[in-house]
């Protein structure tokens, strides 16, 4: 769709004919000429004339194109529109407009007619989803010694074999009368 923009920036889209020696034949690469240069021959500026229509390719020195179609010719009924949809996350410093003010469907809801062709999204992971691979106590003990955590007294929850700790004795204060203990 943006081929004319890429060509204006110095990109050249070439359609390469199929190799005669198979897909794994040795290939030579053209040297990189830098941005704005056409293989060292001449500087490339803005293209002359109007931009090419969408779907046209520059064929370079390979002549006419081979019969290769990278996408299907027929379009779905909703594919005729070429407008861009706004992103769900606004740029920094911009205030997002409410969905009703935009006049279109909400960005979280599919366009009419598109829901039938799309598969349902996968379910979101559970809130308590964690990697459940267990680590033996020997590995944790060696990690504790390697990191020097066996010398740390301020973090009692890191000691191995201790499933919970008494927060009031560890913090050095007694609970107030009528308060809920942790």
UniProtKB/Swiss-Prot annotation:
One of its GO terms (biological process) is response to estrogen. Residues 22-129 are annotated as: Disordered. The keyword Transcription regulation applies. One of its GO terms (molecular function) is transcription coactivator activity. InterPro entries: CITED (IPR007576). Residues 100-117 have a biased composition (Low complexity). Gene3D superfamilies: 6.10.140.2200. It is found in: Nucleus; Cytoplasm. This is Cbp/p300-interacting transactivator 4.
């Amino acid at each position: 769709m943006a081929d004319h923009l890429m060509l204006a920036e110095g990109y050249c889209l070439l359609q390469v004919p199929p190799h005669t020696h198979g897909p794994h034949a040795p290939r030579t690469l053209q040297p990189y000429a830098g941005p704005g240069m056409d293989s060292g021959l001449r500087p490339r500026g803005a293209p002359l004339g109007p931009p090419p229509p969408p779907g046209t390719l520059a064929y370079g020195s390979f002549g006419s194109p081979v019969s290769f179609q990278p996408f299907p010719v027929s379009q779905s009924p909703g594919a005729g529109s070429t407008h861009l949809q706004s992103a769900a996350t606004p740029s920094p410093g911009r205030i997002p407009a409410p969905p009703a003010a935009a006049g279109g469907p909400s960005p979280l809801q599919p366009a009419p007619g598109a829901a039938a062709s799309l598969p349902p999204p996968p379910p979101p992971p559970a809130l308590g989803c964690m990697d459940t691979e267990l680590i033996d106590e020997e590995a944790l003990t060696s990690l504790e010694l390697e990191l020097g955590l066996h010398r740390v007294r301020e973090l009692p929850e890191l000691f191995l074999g201790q499933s919970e700790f008494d927060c009031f004795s560890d913090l050095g204060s007694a609970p107030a009368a009528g308060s809920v203990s942790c």
